[in-house]
């Protein structure tokens, strides 16, 4: 994944090589990439963060939404109001603002598009196991 991205023009800022020896894990890797890099069309499960510099929030939103995946998105900003506006525009099942870990047993977990249908956890996750009944009464 990283090698393919680098061969398509990405630059490794940190990580990118597995340390020698046994028991080594792939290190956290940060890449700077152009908006046409194939890594942006992948659903990445691992410590790899491709970073794209954009000129506007709208450009960043369009680029993020251009993928067929949508499990989680991350927004970092000193302007919380702006970050929430961006988060609301992202086609993603979960959005973390200014944090890396978003898991919470009380919150729904799941994605949009090819990243899943339905939710686990929270009220949304238990709802599909409930029998909903409507009773209409006229008195």
What residues fall within each predicted segment?
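Conserved C-terminal structural/oligomerization subdomain of aldehyde/semialdehyde dehydrogenase
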Residues: 18, 25-139
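Short secondary-structure junctions
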Residues: 9-17
């Amino acid at each position: 994944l990283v090698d393919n991205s680098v061969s398509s023009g990405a630059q490794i800022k940190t990580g990118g090589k597995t340390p020698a020896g046994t028991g080594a894990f792939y290190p956290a890797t940060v890449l700077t990439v152009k908006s046409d890099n194939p890594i942006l069309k992948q659903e990445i499960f691992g410590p790899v963060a491709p970073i794209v510099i954009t000129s506007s929030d709208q450009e960043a939103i369009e680029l993020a939404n251009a993928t067929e995946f949508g499990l989680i998105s991350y927004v970092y900003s000193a302007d919380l109001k702006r970050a929430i506006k961006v988060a609301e525009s992202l086609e993603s099942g979960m959005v973390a603002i200014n944090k890396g870990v978003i898991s919470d047993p009380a919150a729904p977990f799941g994605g949009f598009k090819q990243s899943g249908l339905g939710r686990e956890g929270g009220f949304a996750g238990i709802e599909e196991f409930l029998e909903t009944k409507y009773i209409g009464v006229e008195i």
